[in-house]
Amino acid sequence: NTPDWKFQSDVVSHIKSKFNKQINLAVDVCMCSTTLDGHCCILDKPQTTQALFIDLGRKLKQAGADILAPSDMQKDTVKNLKIETQLPILSYIKFRSNFYSSFRDLANSTPSSERFYQISVADPHSAKIIASQYDKDGADYLMLKPGMTTIDLISMIKCNTYKPVGVYQVSDEYLGLPTDKHLYETYQIFDRVGCNFMVTYGARKL
């Protein structure tokens, strides 16, 4: 069945109605929580995938999203969302990682097979190529995920694209921090290497 994205739209609308222009709301664009196999796309159906993402992007814009953040790692998603919504795009550069396991267990989105469209942790060259492509496709911001395991790529991608580059401190990274002081230290490290922004479950503690 085609999702109607009502839950996503309602959440965005509620947040924006409460905070209005006090915040810029960046909203994740993906479908891993709606597919039966836990994948970020409809496997082997790129046109269907893009049609769904465009539909989701339009509805998120109508609900009040300020920035769209596609995390699917599919070809043309950044370009299509930029053209169809005219919103700023924050594009993920996502690696296949074991550090997502806690979130996947909680969201019941563990994929039925390997997410081959994500980048191998042993292949930094692909991250450089993908970042450059997203830049050409119209991305306004780039974000590496996970954070700590991609820290060596931040400077390179910033130099190649001249775009703000941030990190996503994922579930297993965050759960491994025993105190708020440990959290703040990771923030200082990301800032030290030139990270422009940081997404973390502990944002309110910083």
Question: Predicted regions: what is each one?
Answer:
Residues N1-L206:
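Alpha/beta enzyme core
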